[in-house]
Amino acid sequence: MKEMIGKDLVIVAGPSASGKSHLIRQLTTKRKNKFRDKVYRQLGINPQEPRSHISIGALTKLDSKPGHSRKLIKELIFIHFDITSRHQSDKQHLLKSIANSCRSIKVVTLKTPFDVWHLRMRQRIDVNPTKNPSNIADEIYRLSRFSRYFARWRYESIYKKWEKLIKNIDLDGQLIVKNEEISVKPRKKKTID
């Protein structure tokens, strides 16, 4: 992929509802952030480098959505990779081609315990029941209604597939972040006057 030539990439991966977007916000903020500084040190990332973020799915639509291309101007690009989304084989193939053309590629895998993930999926579905993600995450969540044991096994197998994929990529750095390491501030509730 020619847009990635000479770029430093950080792939932030995890299942739906694991906290990837929150993690990316923390890693791309310009405010003081001890967690970000720790991750940057561990991965050898220059904190002064201009950065942006984009989802792996958006990279497949650069021709139809030219606005996405401007995110690729920066030298450091964080890529949001949902390991439970649809069209995994296409996205994995794209990731491999990107890895061959970029200057460096590092991976941050967000490890979320099954019970925490299950609670977040339930909350997501309760908030907006008509917008269930039609992906592997939804299948696992539905399976958990009948057999929590098999759902947990299926959930863990997604991480194993991801680990197998990234073993075949020549990485410049890899980090596993446990969900409890990320500081989460509760969102302020909107008040209606």
Segment roles from a protein language model:
Residues 12:
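Hydrophobic anchor at the beta1->P-loop junction of P-loop NTPases
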Residues 15-16:
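The conserved Walker
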Residues 2-6:
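Phosphate-binding P-loop
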Residues 24-83:
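Conserved substrate/cofactor phosphate-moiety recognition/catalytic segment
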Residues 102-121:
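Conserved phosphate-donor/acceptor-positioning beta-strand/loop module used by diverse small-molecule
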Residues 9:
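Walker A (P-loop) ATP-phosphate-binding motif of ABC ATPase nucleotide-binding domains
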